[in-house]
Amino acid sequence: FGHRFVQLCEIHDIPHTEIALEMGHKLTAEHLAPYEGQGYTGFLVNLDETSTGVLYDIHLISQFCHRNNIFLVVDSISSFLADPFNMQALGVDVMITGSQKALACPPGISIIVLAPQAVERVCSREIKSMYFNLKDALKNGERGQTPFTPAVGILRQINARLKEIEAAGGVESENQRMAALAADFREKIKNLPFTIVSQ
């Protein structure tokens, strides 16, 4: 799924460098070393590679971005609520997730969370997009609206799900519940006749 970021850069003629990893392998400091101090301005990463189950080291990536003053955009669709992720503590500029996966609602809503510096960046630029104009979304959000009619039913389900998570002890409790489910699943499949490809 990380390749989709590459496709987006290609479609919009954005100069980019792809760090292509072998399937199932994690990102290491050695992968990042050649890019230290090279003037990169943005780092796009999916926190968890859904197809292989590899969870990337977001602390490693965050530290690299801070050292190099790089804007960090994290796709956490398949890890949101399933793995610990503190956007503010990590200094992540933009976090993308969806209504499905661990949020456990039907697919159909994309959620983009902007840190204050990301809001400032969006508002200071001319945006040439009708249906994906974050400046319009922010402006409409000030009055509790969206630029276009959203999937209202799914928004109501997200609202109910967030209340459910809060009542059950909050995000940390949900992370622990997911970790227990994952450990149980891994234990039950470890003797089955197949190979797990992730490191």
What are these language model-derived features?
Residues E10, H66, K190:
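Anion (oxyanion) recognition and catalysis
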Residues Q88-Q100:
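Conserved active-site segment immediately N-terminal to the catalytic lysine
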Residues R186-Q199:
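Conserved small-domain helix->loop->beta segment predominantly found in fold-type I
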Residues H25-L81, V94:
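Active-site phosphate-binding strand-loop segment of PLP-dependent enzymes
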Residues F1-G42:
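PLP-dependent aminotransferase-like
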Residues Q100-D184:
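Active-site C-terminal subdomain of aminotransferase-like
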Residues H16, L72-V73, I196:
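Hydrophobic beta-strand scaffold residues
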